[in-house]
Amino acid sequence: MGEEVEEETGLRSEVEKTSVSKEEVVEQEEINLEDPKNTIFITKRNGKQEPIDLEKIHRVIFWASENLDVSPSQVELNSQIQFYDGITTEEIHETMIKAAADLISTESPDYQYLAARLLIFHLRKKAYGQFKPPSLYEQVKKMVSEGRYDPELLTDYTEDEFSTMDGFIDHWRDMKFTYAAVKQLEGKYLVQNRVNGDVYESPQFIFLLVGACLFSKYPKETRLDYVERFYNAASTFKLSLPTPIMSGVRTPTRQF
């Protein structure tokens, strides 16, 4: 996958918190792609090839399964039977997501959260090269310099105000979304290149920055309070916003 997986999965000690049943351990031992004669080579984003590391895949799936009524081993098994020599890391991510999504049913609804977490992991890796998002100020500076965010964000707010707003953000709320919700965010709202599929942000930045734009002209003494209240309502879906607002506000098109 990537060198950052250990750092990423350690963000909240996810793996250590996950309990593994004896049956799941047995299933894992039966997966024998690590046998030298069965070695699969993966193609990384930089074009380099290296042997597949099943332990990294195992850790990511078990991390995403935390506190969910799902079988991580079933998702692993369903993923690995689709791996082939030369598969890219992006295809591995997508295969894992599909393996989880294919198990969603009325009898096993928690797979919608597992698939969503794996998709969020994938989107963040595409956007940032790692699981952990950058600070709000770093994100805005980079996106403004690339012409993807409205440059007035940097003139309307000071670096200290961005630091304060950064404290409002709870990126872990991404992990509470359903698969359908994340797919909608990916398809309609995230700033991205729709030609090559590059993604440049993750969901919590949308909710915070829409509020920051909407209240940017309010009195400085009170506007951050409005931004925080807006963010908390929008990011927990207590507030529904039209597509032009969600997709356009914070970008040079503005749409408000």
Predicted segments, located by residue:
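Extended catalytic cores of very large enzyme megasubunits
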Residues: 2-256
